[in-house]
Amino acid sequence: MMKKTIAMLALGTAMVFAGAAGAAEIEVKMLNKGEKGMMVFEPDFVRAAPGDTIHFVPVDKGHNVESIQGMIPEGAQPFKGKFSEELTVKLDKEGVYGVKCLP
């Protein structure tokens, strides 16, 4: 039986609304084992601006990513990816986003 582990990824926004022209795409890997331990996101902290996209990649199968209820900015859309599938999320609200891998 796999231990249920919650990994946190804070997507802090320090810049004013950046607009699509300067938008960046940031890749976050979902791993069984990484530099900081087991069942992790790498990187585990990302600084992004509104308009940026975060691309979650399940390097090891069996992972997903989903926002944590109550841990995303007010007015931001919650998101949930399928197991073993990539998910791209465009950030439209400034704030901190908490995410987890369900298994």
Task: Please tell me what each predicted stretch does.
Residues G19-P103:
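Extracytoplasmic copper-binding redox domains, predominantly the cupredoxin/blue-copper superfamily
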Residues L9-V16:
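Bacterial N-terminal signal peptides
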